[in-house]
Amino acid sequence: MWNALQDRDSAEVLGHRQRWLRVGTLVLALTGTFLIGFLFGWFIKPSNEATGNVSHSGMKKEFLHELKAENIKKFLYNFTRTPHLAGTQNNFELAKQIHDQWKEFGLDLVELSHYDVLLSYPNKTHPNYISIINEDGNEIFKTSLSEQPPPGYENISDVVPPYSAFSPQGTPEGDLVYVNYARTEDFFKLEREMKISCSGKIVIARYGKVFRGNMVKNAQLAGAKGMILYSDPADYFVPAVKSYPDGWNLPGGGVQRGNVLNLNGAGDPLTPGYPANEHAYRHELTNAVGLPSIPVHPIGYDDAQKLLEHMGGPAPPDSSWKGGLKVPYNVGPGFAGNFSTQKVKMHIHSYTKVTRIYNVIGTLKGALEPDRYVILGGHRDAWVFGGIDPQSGAAVVHEIVRSFGTLKKKGRRPRRTILFASWDAEEFGLLGSTEWAEEHSRLLQERGVAYINADSSIEGNYTLRVDCTPLMYSLVYNLTKELQSPDEGFEGKSLYDSWKEKSPSPEFIGMPRISKLGSGNDFEVFFQRLGIASGRARYTKNWKTNKVSSYPLYHSVYETYELVVKFYDPTFKYHLTVAQVRGAMVFELANSIVLPFDCQSYAVALKKYADTIYNISMKHPQEMKAYMISFDSLFSAVNNFTDVASKFNQRLQELDKSNPILLRIMNDQLMYLERAFIDPLGLPGRPFYRHIIYAPSSHNKYAGESFPGIYDALFDISSKVNASKAWNEVKRQISIATFTVQAAAETLREVA
């Protein structure tokens, strides 16, 4: 079990500290008047131990210079030789390899942290597929059972066939209904405007726009008895680019795997809220959290063509329902003309199993503030080879660990403790990170400074993409001004310059875009449940010209090392840039005397979010007046927060940094600010999402929503049966948000 207080290698780590403690004990025994002097010496004078007589900027320069593109390339190659599905021997072997290498790199402590969680696998003897059957029940078409292997991988075993993880077993048959992206608004269009019911039908939807788990939830609410997911060329095939292996587009037989859970931050479905260790109480499977109730299966667009080409019913309501296949995209239900007697049948035989998973946790102890933790984490498990997701991120983490280890071997420790994590079972619902955070939640809430996520390093090669708490805005802006841009046409210019020009903020003129944190990745439990300041960075595509969802080969067998080397980043300059950004964020958070958090950026963001949610509410002016809904209290709280944050920053500028007590007080105020936005009761219906300012959208887990309690209360409010009850809930959520913002402001006031 990971224990941050273990004393391995203590002679090296704490020798200097113990000498001062012995002196301090003697002094205290003589007189208490030397206590303050002792504390000053403890916090300030031993700084040479952390830096080896090298300045902060010099140490950072040395750290960044140590990061090498060729190492990241080598690590990526090594991590993508075989599949690393969670719960398999291959992934366990990779965990042990990373464990051993992190020890070689010089970390003080590296451990494997295991949990027994519910996972889902396809049945090897009864494969999953979809068929079209005639009136006699005979199959006249069936979908592919697997993808064609990419060149060079024909003899690789243990490639899991395409499936939707956690789908229940079942063989439903019936008429097909095309539901576009299966978003909430798509079902509203079908049911309210087109008067088409999905009850008792099998629905087919194209991937994109929203998280697949939300798609399945919407289908269940609409009464569907089964769901088919596919990747449409309009969303996963860029014009003028060839399909893999000749290009980076998705072949017709390529399929996106993925889980279809709706956990809402619960972690392991059998142990929601608590770590899935040997002592855990486990719910029966029938009471598990977040499992879908209808069979679900993914297919490629070649097979989707066969299912959609003879659809009957009305034409698509508008062009946004048409994809890139040569089919009419009729909605159904059922097939037309001579095919009207044919039905669709699903054959789903996947099973769930409690399986052991392994995180790798590495510790680099801080020299001066060992009880303050900065965490860098990314997952290791992959659906198949994981050339981009996750191993492009895992390779970067590996190189960052190596660089910090090199500095440590030279006697240059960080000021604060850095924890490095290789998470398992992220693809199955963020299970590895969530279970570990649940087990150590009290410690993390007390000592966690920040969490930096390190999943896929690239999803394109156009510009930087950052999602983070407003506390980190200034940190990210400042460090990107110090890094060189890898982009063509920006030689000699900073990363900030290219980022600002290619991805300008729609909210703040003259600044690069920074997005809100949603979910779908391992920062979720740290940010949404524990209130630890979080952020992530990667290189992305040009979203203005490249309209496809994510990158085309996402979660397919074709996501290989060769995909990255041939098409995305041949020189690994973008990987190196991402390593520099992630590494510099960790470095600054772990080494800055004053934590590099900016509470005034939070104040600006709160004002923007309050204005936005108010404008949404004013789409219903009559109801706002009738039910006496007012945002005055929220605006007042935001104004108070803004005033207090400004005064806090002024005190911070005047802070005597040689005073360890005052320094610790103000750093703690900064560290705990994110925690102040946490409501222990959570959001309505989503108790593990506890951040009142940010949460994943209820309608798309990938997207972040501000003031989510108010937003959800206002969503589709005109259709609520009990209008008075609905508007009272809006009033209640405004009250909760007001209290939370005001309470957060109180934490920034000068300590009496």
UniProtKB/Swiss-Prot annotation:
Its cofactor is Zn(2+). One of its GO terms (biological process) is proteolysis. One of its GO terms (molecular function) is tetrahydrofolyl-poly(glutamate) polymer binding. It is an enzyme of class 3 (hydrolase). Zn(2+) 2 binds at D389, E427, H555. Binds 2 Zn(2+) ions per subunit. Required for NAALADase activity. Residues 45-752 are extracellular. Its EC number is 3.4.17.21. Glycans are attached at N78, N123, N155, N338, N461, N478, N615, N640, N722. The modification Phosphoserine is found at S10. This is Glutamate carboxypeptidase 2. The lineage of its organism: Eukaryota, Metazoa, Chordata, Craniata, Vertebrata.
